[in-house]
Amino acid sequence: MDEFIKMLKKVKPNVDFENEEALVDDGLLESLDIISIISEIADQYGVHIPSDEIIPDNLNSAEALYELVEDLK
């Protein structure tokens, strides 16, 4: 999970990914940020996130996003 957080901070360095639980709902991640994160996940983890999984519930916290990636491996 630490490496995953580092990857997220590379995309959006000023966000507290360890503690934030409403990244999308609070507007901390915008559409271009989400595209960048999905691209990084594909590059680093070899995981393709289907468009029907790109929903706030899966993106509102680093933990939720990490669980999604693990489920898709």
Which residues are covered by each model-predicted region?
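Thiotemplate assembly-line natural product biosynthesis machinery
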Residues: 1-16, 67-73
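Short Gly/charged-rich anion-binding patches and loops
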Residues: 3, 36-37
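Phosphopantetheine carrier-protein modules
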Residues: 9-28, 47-55
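Residue-level recognition of oxygen-bearing side chains
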Residues: 22, 37, 64
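Two-component histidine kinase catalytic core, primarily the HATPase_c
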Residues: 33
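C-terminal structural segments of small proteins and small subunits
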Residues: 47-72
